[in-house]
């Protein structure tokens, strides 16, 4: 399963050990522009706008601002069923 992780902060760092090994992280997205074009765990971090056009199964929200992130993704045209 190909996933996108939205959020690269403390919640991701605490939860990454629980990601199942069959999950392939395609890319990280984050609203912090200082993190864009850097890497976390060997995976590139990009702007949320860059997720459009990528092939993935789900976007997993890993932030205390999950509700706001979900609204942001809806505004980008991401369907609700793709967001966890």
Predicted segments, located by residue:
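Flexible, charged surface loops at secondary-structure boundaries
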Residues: 1, 20-21, 51-56
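Phosphate-bearing ligand-interacting subdomains
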Residues: 33-84
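Functionally constrained cores in energy, signaling, and assembly domains
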Residues: 15-16, 23, 58, 63
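Short, solvent-exposed amphipathic alpha-helical segments in soluble enzyme
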Residues: 18-24, 75-78
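Glycine-rich adenosine-cofactor-binding loop
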Residues: 1-19
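Short internal beta-strands
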Residues: 26-31
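A short linear-motif detector with a strong N-terminal bias
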Residues: 4-8, 24-25, 38-40, 64
């Amino acid at each position: 399963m190909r996933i996108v992780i939205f959020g690269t902060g403390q919640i991701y760092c605490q939860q990454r050990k629980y990601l199942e090994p069959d999950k392939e992280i395609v890319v990280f997205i984050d609203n912090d522009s200082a993190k864009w074009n850097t890497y976390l765990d060997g995976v590139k971090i990009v702007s949320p706008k860059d997720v459009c056009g990528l092939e993935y199964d789900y976007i997993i929200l890993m932030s205390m601002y999950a509700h706001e992130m979900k609204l942001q993704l809806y505004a980008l045209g991401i369907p609700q069923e793709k967001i966890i």
